[in-house]
């Protein structure tokens, strides 16, 4: 006869309630999570003790998470609302929650019939949740910082990556209890996506093909995983005259914003690396693919050239000081190529309608050199007419390493609003501060 398998000890009621709560929170079902702990609290209100205190804190945590993912707290002006309509800032909400959890950790209000081993579990979980709440406050501050950057001429994504990395390192493995794993997973998914996107933004601006491609792909894959969580959830809608229907849960604003940032970076990536990407497919297929981008920079510039009979529109990459520059596409890390010199330090990484006009390039570089301070303002449009070659040049700089030039083989006025507004529009779309402004729900962008 084989030995009898010992029966597993029954899971304490408290543990089962906690596991259900965090599994709901892990799939962003804030209302279900909140309802469950409130029902449990109502059923145990005579019990008192740490358990009741923790249930109250968890109901507040579910409500705080809902506000956090909605991003409605961004850009709130202190004292700008009446006492009755004022929404508490996310920091106030989480600070209050942190204080509640601290009381459970220290065992204040622990009078009640909770078993000692359960008390220990509740204290341990509350301690880890304190770290989670602190991490949330820091990431909320990070979103606030990104939102305020929308008014800047240039957003330094590399600096943002450094700040986010520091937060991730600070809280790594700080809320690792198995019961909290759904919460930890959803937190990690969010910061991973954000980090991949900000790294991609920094790398596209440095014209680094493979690293930006890898980060965009990683962000895309993780956003798909996240999106499937909402697809699997259905919410039932009861109709006025009976009957009901089910539909997928609407994702929170934070998820939708990360999707928007990814799509904007994808449009910019497909423009900056158009040459390398077009080598992988046919011209007609490439045109179809870029037309799906929003905005479609390639299509927009092609239309402008046809409409105004421009000789050329180029995106120039200033690679001076960039030791790793090797030209379009991917290059083996150990392949050697001599650093560019002279005019090759200013390649046209995009040139429409065909290859860069070599005869105009000395003029373009001369204008870039002479008007450096104007171009470095990242908002001025520079005009130059050369009567020797009967050609007009309009230049602007959307970001530090890149300049857009329009070349006309005829005389054009520096006050021509069509050309200036077009350059401003393309430049603004490449910087896209509107994406950062649209972090706040209801903002245009």
UniProtKB/Swiss-Prot annotation:
Keywords: Disease variant, Intellectual disability, Lysosome, Membrane. Belongs to the KICS2 family. One of its GO terms (biological process) is cellular response to glucose starvation. As part of the KICSTOR complex functions in the amino acid-sensing branch of the TORC1 signaling pathway. Recruits, in an amino acid-independent manner, the GATOR1 complex to the lysosomal membranes and allows its interaction with GATOR2 and the RAG GTPases. Functions upstream of the RAG GTPases and is required to negatively regulate mTORC1 signaling in absence of amino acids. In absence of the KICSTOR complex mTORC1 is constitutively localized to the lysosome and activated. The KICSTOR complex is also probably involved in the regulation of mTORC1 by glucose. It is found in: Lysosome membrane. It holds the Pfam family C12orf66_like. Its main location: membrane. It is linked to Intellectual developmental disorder, autosomal recessive 83: An autosomal recessive disorder characterized by developmental delay, mild to moderate intellectual disability, and poor or absent speech. Additional variable features include seizures, hearing impairment, hypotonia, and non-specific facial dysmorphism. This is KICSTOR subunit 2. The keyword Membrane applies. It comes from the Eukaryota. The gene is KICS2.
């Amino acid at each position: 006869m084989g030995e009898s398998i010992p029966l597993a000890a029954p899971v304490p009621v408290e543990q089962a309630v906690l596991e259900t709560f965090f599994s709901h929170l892990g799939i962003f079902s804030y209302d279900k999570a909140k309802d469950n702990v409130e029902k449990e609290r109502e059923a145990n209100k005579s019990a008192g003790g740490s358990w009741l205190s923790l249930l109250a804190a968890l109901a507040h945590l579910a409500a705080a998470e809902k506000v956090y993912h909605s991003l409605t707290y961004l850009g709130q002006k202190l004292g700008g609302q009446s006492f009755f309509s004022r929404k508490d800032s996310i920091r106030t909400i989480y600070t209050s929650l942190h204080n509640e959890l601290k009381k459970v950790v220290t065992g204040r209000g622990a009078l009640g019939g909770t078993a000692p081993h359960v008390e220990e579990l509740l204290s341990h979980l509350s301690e880890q949740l304190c770290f989670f709440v602190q991490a949330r406050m820091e990431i909320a501050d990070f979103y606030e910082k990104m939102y305020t950057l929308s008014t800047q001429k240039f957003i330094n994504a590399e600096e943002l990556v450094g700040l986010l990395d520091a937060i991730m390192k600070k809280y790594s493995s700080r809320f690792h209890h198995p019961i909290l794993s759904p919460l930890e997973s959803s937190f990690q998914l969010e910061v991973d996506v954000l980090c991949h996107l900000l790294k991609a933004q920094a790398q596209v601006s440095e014209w680094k093909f493979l690293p930006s491609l890898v980060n965009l792909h990683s962000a895309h894959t993780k956003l798909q995983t996240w999106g499937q969580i909402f697809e699997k959830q259905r919410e039932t809608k009861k109709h006025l005259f009976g009957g009901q229907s089910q539909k997928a849960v609407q994702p929170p604003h934070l998820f939708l914003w990360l999707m928007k940032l990814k799509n904007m970076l994808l449009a910019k990536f497909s423009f900056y690396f158009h040459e390398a990407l077009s080598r992988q497919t046919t011209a007609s297929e490439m045109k179809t693919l870029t037309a799906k981008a929003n905005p479609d920079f390639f299509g927009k510039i092609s239309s402008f050239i046809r409409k105004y009979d421009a000789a050329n529109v180029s995106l120039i990459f200033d690679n001076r000081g960039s030791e790793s520059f090797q030209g379009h596409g991917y290059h083996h890390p150990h392949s050697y190529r001599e650093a560019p010199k002279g005019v090759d330090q200013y390649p046209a990484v995009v040139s429409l309608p065909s290859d860069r006009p070599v005869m105009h390039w000395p003029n373009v570089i001369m204008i870039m050199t002479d008007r450096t301070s104007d171009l470095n303002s990242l908002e001025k449009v520079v005009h130059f007419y050369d009567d020797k070659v009967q050609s007009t040049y309009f230049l602007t700089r959307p970001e530090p390493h890149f300049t857009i030039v329009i070349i006309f083989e005829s005389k054009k006025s520096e006050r021509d609003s069509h050309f200036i507004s077009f350059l401003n529009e393309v430049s603004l779309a490449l910087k896209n501060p509107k994406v950062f402004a649209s972090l706040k729900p209801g903002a245009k962008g």
